[in-house]
């Protein structure tokens, strides 16, 4: 569909020193922590019961993750989320994950609000503040989960001037969401522009947690069917989010047609020139054969289509079974870790 303005001109312009593309999330419309978990651990919701929320069910001690791997080589690990600390038990989970610092809503300027939520701009300024206060020899990993564009999108707000709209048809909630994305693009330009100028090597990994839940009448307009009766490939379109990995130093420009959130930390480590731990090396190898996997299924490179995990055959089945075994060992098999 067409809009009255370019929604993400800065994001669209990012090419140099950037890997950019689309990734499968395992959730739609809600349950952000499952996306966080897939990114941080390299594990997949494909092997957990439907409806699971990992943060509330499965994290009772420190799992092997990007956090533990970076701490092992001397990084300070910081989590930032400009909302209440008890949401999805993050006040318990983040320390259990090994984060050295956590910053929640009380650590942000609560006058910097768009609709009901702290802005991306305020979050990014907090990231900059933490970077500028670091010790001279301190290596930092900062994970931040934004709130600005959180659903729903049906109320009108005095503090938000909606600039974007669809042309030729009117879905008010979609227009609000598109306007929020436009605001996010401006904040992203601030963040990248700042770190372009610093002397330290910096890598920024940016991805959507899930697609928004919008008016049910919008989806037939979008895909001709709505939310029911979809093929697996059509369903996976609803679970696809944008991502990029940008560096402020010279790195290859790359376009990725499709990956999944469980692979992003491996891509980030490779891009940063950090030696891959054994689990991430397995994921890097698996990625060559199965480029994307999530709670709904996987993309089979050999067959050129999406399949349900239970329908995997041949080498696909071997990769997925080994992945499931390694994930079980990573999550539950404390005796044999």
Predicted regions and their residues:
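Solvent-exposed soluble domains appended to multi-pass membrane proteins
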Residues: 1-337
């Amino acid at each position: 569909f067409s809009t009255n303005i370019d929604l993400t001109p800065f994001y669209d312009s990012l090419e140099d020193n950037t890997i950019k593309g689309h990734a499968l999330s395992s959730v739609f419309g809600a349950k952000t922590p499952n996306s966080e978990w897939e990114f941080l651990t390299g594990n997949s919701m494909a092997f957990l019961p439907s409806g699971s929320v990992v943060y509330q069910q499965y994290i009772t001690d420190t799992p092997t993750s990007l956090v533990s791997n970076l701490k092992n080589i001397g990084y300070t690990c910081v989590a930032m989320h400009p909302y209440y600390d008890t949401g999805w038990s993050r006040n318990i989970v983040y320390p259990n994950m090994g984060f050295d610092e956590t910053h929640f809503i009380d650590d942000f300027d609560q006058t910097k609000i768009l609709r009901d939520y702290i802005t991306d701009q305020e979050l990014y300024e907090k990231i900059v503040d933490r970077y500028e206060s670091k010790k001279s020899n301190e290596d930092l990993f900062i994970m931040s989960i934004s709130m600005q564009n959180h659903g729903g999108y049906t109320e009108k707000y005095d503090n938000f001037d909606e600039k974007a709209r669809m042309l030729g048809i009117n879905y008010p909630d979609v227009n609000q969401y598109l306007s929020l994305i436009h605001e996010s693009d401006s904040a992203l330009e601030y963040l990248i522009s700042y770190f372009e100028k610093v002397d330290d090597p910096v890598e920024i990994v940016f991805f959507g947690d899930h697609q928004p839940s919008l008016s049910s009448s919008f989806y037939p307009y979008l895909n001709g069917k709505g939310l029911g009766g979809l093929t697996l490939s059509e369903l996976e379109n609803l679970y696809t989010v944008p991502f990029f990995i940008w560096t402020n130093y010279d790195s290859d420009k790359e376009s990725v047609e499709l990956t999944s959130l469980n692979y992003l930390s491996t891509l980030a480590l490779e891009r940063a020139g950090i030696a891959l731990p054994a689990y991430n090396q397995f994921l890097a190898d698996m990625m060559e054969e199965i480029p994307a996997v999530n709670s709904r299924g996987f993309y089979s490179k050999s067959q050129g289509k999406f399949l349900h995990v239970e329908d995997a055959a041949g080498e696909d089945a071997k990769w997925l079974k080994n992945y499931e075994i390694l994930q079980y060992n990573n999550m539950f098999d404390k005796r044999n870790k």
